[in-house]
């Protein structure tokens, strides 16, 4: 392939100064900027109708801007592949998970409140050292979190859909959670949204956690049952980057009850743009050379 047309959402700034490449901007809401497009780079947030719009252009690849692809229909038009943004967001999301965990474990909300009121007030907090942390989900994001937890001298219990042994030790299964949760000082949720994980963090899950334990959610909002979070927010410390719904209504009780709410910004760092740039250039290069696309999660 010598001539490639790529349509890119204005959410991204991609450097594609490559001979034979035509780069067009497309908001994916208006008609496509060309009759034929080879590769479409989606905005941060995708909707099911976006796939149909892209398919009408004869595109070979829809490159998502997210790791998750739960909003994409599984019955794709023939010839269209969907790739996620694995390698783009894992590090940044793990950073936010660690920041949220430390914020809650060191009671930094308390320190901030004292600062605003100009009070010098010392206190002790739980901290992370010697604590037990359950990590639910050990995919790209979960593994990145596990790597960052290692220097903090914690006991990390890893949990995934399927229990197994790997090079790092035991991975417990979701079915082990009822026995594991009461032991945890903190639980970090980093699973994809699937049929088996939707509403996983429900009343039963939260009831099994001990008082003052920390729950960090950097997965998807629908992994947790919102009413259950509200019900347990007075005895648990909730640090949520994702919620259901998003955005939360401004009068939602979680704003007051949660220890920390961040507006789904797990991947939002400058590194995201550099890494997305590298990924798109890789996809274009593979298309030109006839190599398979990388990160394909749906389609051919």
Task: List each language-model region with its residue ranges.
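Phosphate/diphosphate ligand-binding glycine-rich loop within oxidoreductases
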Residues: 38-112
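Glycine-rich NAD(P)-binding loop of Rossmann-like domains
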Residues: 111-144
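Rossmann-like dinucleotide-binding domain for NAD(H)/NADP(H)
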Residues: 212-214, 218-300
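Oxidoreductase and adenylate-handling cofactor-binding alpha/beta cores
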Residues: 94-110, 151-152, 277-286, 291
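Rossmann-like adenosine-cofactor binding region
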Residues: 162-253
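Short, conserved loop/helix-junction motifs that constitute active-site signature segments
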Residues: 50-58, 74-78, 205-211, 231-234, ...
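N-terminal glycine-/charge-rich "phosphate-binding" loop or analogous flexible N-terminal tail
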Residues: 1-42
């Amino acid at each position: 392939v010598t001539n490639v047309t790529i349509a890119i959402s204005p959410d991204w700034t991609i450097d594609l100064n490559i001979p034979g490449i035509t780069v067009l901007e497309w908001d994916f809401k208006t008609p496509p900027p060309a009759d034929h497009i080879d590769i479409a780079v989606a905005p941060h947030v995708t909707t099911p109708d976006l796939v149909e719009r892209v398919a009408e252009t004869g595109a070979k690849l829809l490159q998502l801007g997210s790791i998750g692809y739960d909003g994409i229909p599984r019955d794709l038009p023939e010839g269209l592949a969907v790739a996620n943004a694995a390698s783009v967001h894992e590090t940044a999301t793990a950073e936010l998970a660690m920041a949220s965990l430390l914020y809650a474990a060191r009671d930094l909300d308390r320190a901030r409140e004292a600062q605003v009121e100009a009070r010098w007030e010392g206190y002790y907090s739980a901290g992370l050292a010697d604590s037990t942390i359950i990590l639910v989900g050990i995919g790209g994001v979960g593994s990145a979190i596990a790597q960052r937890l290692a220097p903090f001298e914690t006991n990390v219990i890893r949990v995934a859909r399927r229990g197994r042994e790997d090079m790092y030790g035991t991975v417990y299964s979701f079915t082990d959670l009822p026995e594991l949760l009461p032991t945890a000082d903190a639980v970090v949720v980093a699973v994809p949204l699937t049929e088996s994980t939707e509403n996983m963090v429900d009343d039963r899950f939260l009831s099994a956690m001990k008082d003052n334990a920390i729950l960090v959610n950097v997965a998807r909002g629908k992994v947790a049952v919102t009413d259950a979070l509200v019900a347990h927010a007075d005895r648990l410390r909730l640090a949520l980057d994702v919620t259901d719904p998003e955005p939360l209504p401004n009068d939602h009780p979680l704003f007051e009850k949660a220890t920390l709410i961040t507006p789904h910004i797990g991947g939002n760092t400058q590194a995201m743009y550099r890494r997305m740039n590298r990924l798109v250039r890789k996809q274009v290069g593979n298309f030109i050379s006839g190599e398979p696309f990388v990160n394909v999660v749906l389609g051919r």
